[in-house]
């Protein structure tokens, strides 16, 4: 039975299957690409945290939800010998954030209506303490993704990858536009993915130059 059909039955999830919730083409690419010498930073913890921890040298995992972070931490403690810490960076209440555009990298807000009036500025900026060109891969699959992109793009080393899930969403157009040109190579992994009946798009950009292309 194809993996897609298997994933649609029962109670399977990315968390129970210990995989990132990306399209199947992206999952195959990541499985083939990751290796033990890599440093990875991820916005959004879960099945991807196990997946990366089992395959790379260093992992920094950022999570905004305290209940979910505790669940992931407990599962890592029990089931993962190479247990990375999950760093909890909660959003902060901000009345001005209610008027911000989730497509604006300077907005620091989520497109999820349940987070209206909350700012993810500290969450997006959690990568700022690392040197430029430090990570082999930055995985953006959490909140306020355009803002996370703004802070993380310069942290990808030459030859490294920046991966954005759900890249087809209109409010991520800034990311696509910012990485056009000779400094980055785009890898488009559109198609089906586990646990969903619909197709979506996961994109990876490989940094080809020592310059990130950002101002």
Predicted regions and their residues:
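S-adenosyl-L-methionine
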Residues: 73-132
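Short, contiguous clusters of charged residues that form electrostatic/catalytic patches at enzyme active sites
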Residues: 24-28, 50, 121-125, 133, ...
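C-terminal substrate-binding/active-site "lid" region of AdoMet-derived donor-dependent transferases
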Residues: 127-137, 143-215
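Class I SAM-dependent methyltransferase Rossmann-like catalytic core
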Residues: 1-37, 107-119
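Generic enzyme active-site microenvironment
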Residues: 40, 61, 139, 163-164
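SAM cofactor-binding core of SAM-dependent methyltransferases
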Residues: 24-97
């Amino acid at each position: 039975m194809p993996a897609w059909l298997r994933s649609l039955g029962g109670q399977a999830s990315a968390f129970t299957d210990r995989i990132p919730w990306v399209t199947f083409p992206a999952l195959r690419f990541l499985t083939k690409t990751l290796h033990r010498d890599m440093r990875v930073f991820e916005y959004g913890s879960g099945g991807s945290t196990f997946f990366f921890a089992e395959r790379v040298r260093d992992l920094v995992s950022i999570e905004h939800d305290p209940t979910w972070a505790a669940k992931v931490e407990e599962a890592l403690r029990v089931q993962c010998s190479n247990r990375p810490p999950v760093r909890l960076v909660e959003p902060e209440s901000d009345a001005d954030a209610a008027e911000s555009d989730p497509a604006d990298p300077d907005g620091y807000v989520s497109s999820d209506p349940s987070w209206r009036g909350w700012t993810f500025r500290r969450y997006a900026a959690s990568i700022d303490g690392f040197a430029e060109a430090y990570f082999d891969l930055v995985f953006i699959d959490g909140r306020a993704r355009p803002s996370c992109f703004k802070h993380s793009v310069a942290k990808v080393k030459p030859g490294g990858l920046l991966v954005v899930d759900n890249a087809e969403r209109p409010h991520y157009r800034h990311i696509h536009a910012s990485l056009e040109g000779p400094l980055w190579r785009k890898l488009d992994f559109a198609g089906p993915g586990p646990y969903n009946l619909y197709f979506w798009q996961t994109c990876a950009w490989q940094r080809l130059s020592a310059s990130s292309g950002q101002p």
